[in-house]
Amino acid sequence: VSGANLGPDWERLPDGTAYRQAARVVVFGDDGRVLLARGHDADQPERSWYFTIGGGIEPGESPRQAAVRELAEEAGLWVDPQVLVGPVLTRQARFDFFAETVRQDEVFFLAHVPAGSAVSTDGWTAVERGFMDEVCWWEAGDLAQVTREIFPAQLPALVRQWRSGWDGTVIHLGLQDERTTIASPATTRQASSASEEGHHR
């Protein structure tokens, strides 16, 4: 059984939890900047976060193929699947999505593109347009100062580590609970949002 309005790549586990496997990409420009998406919770408009490009793995796709497709759809950037680095990281995430708790098993890759590569959101699906706000380039060193949520939470440190290359170690973060009940206070995010806007484009 599919995950209701979540999309066709979601299924229901025996306990009713919506679940999918996903592939994600940490994208670096040749200038060292990193590409992130920003999204919001439609049911909690005050909650906004940054996350990596990526999404569900479709039937017949490998994680690498899914990562390339998602990068094209969400950011308008095309890369050869063979130039992706990794997988560099895996994790299981539990989070709120369209008013329910879901679980997603994720595998991460690295991609490198020319500095200043223009991004496009023309390929966003209806589901993505319902919660995604923008795709933008960040200076890697600035991520540590962001007080909005970032997923995974370890991303700022990982970006600093991977910016100069990957040492071949696959990091396994295990299960990470990102539901609202354990999230950072919304007031902290709201207070910082004005200073973040425009700083990272």
What is each of the regions a protein language model found here?
Residues 1-30:
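Acidic, metal-coordinating catalytic segment for phosphate/diphosphate chemistry
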Residues 20, 45-47, 52, 102-106:
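Short connector loops at helix/strand junctions that flank enzyme active sites
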Residues 48, 116-201:
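Nudix hydrolase/Nudix homology domain
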Residues 19, 59, 63, 151, ...:
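Hydrophobic (often cysteine-bearing) scaffold residues that line and stabilize catalytic clefts
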Residues 33-34:
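Entry beta-strands of beta-propeller and related beta-repeat scaffolds
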Residues 57-148, 189:
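Unchanged
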